[in-house]
Amino acid sequence: EKLEEVLLSRIDLFEKMGCRASDHAFTRVPYKRADAAELDRVFKKALGGEELSECEVDEYKTELMRFFAKEYARRGWGMEIHIGATRNNNSRMFKSLGPDSGFDSIADHEVADNLSRLLDSLDVEDLLPKTILFTLNPKDNYVLGAMLGNFQNSQAASKIQFGSAWWFNDNIDGMREQMKALANTG
């Protein structure tokens, strides 16, 4: 509860400063629901310096993302989700230069099932915000292109959108392939 209060205060501040969109990134889209008691247990475990299991991390990330998305929907914000960057791959260079210093690359995880479940869990509560989905792995262009149509509604034109080709795909081939996938699935 206290964490949610702190997060809401930060969202309030960003909104006061004119912000109307958020940006989130996942190497791999998580989806594992948990109740408040489980989340409290996981949070306390992390605060105690204990290592979390992959399941616990997924529970926490899922519910945190759902919290953010619901709040964005209530406020009429847009939400960007960037999927598929694997960070800081070169340990030697990480040690020498620090994080995010040019040693990131494309991740290769399944996207469709967890992303669909995450979006659907918000949609059934009518709290799915306007969303822009980005993928770094071009193998997921068709997945996202098809996914867009699943959650459109009359609340907003193009409520769920496919973000432009980015990073390693921000080139003529990447942009063409993305637009072709979008056209073929739209």
Identify the residue ranges that each predicted region occupies.
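Histidine/acidic residue-rich metal-binding segments in metalloenzymes
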Residues: 1-130, 139-157, 174-186
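Short His-Asn-centered micro-motif
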Residues: 25, 133-137, 163-165
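His/Asp/Glu-enriched short active-site or ligand-binding loop at hydrolase and phosphoryl-transfer sites
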Residues: 159-171
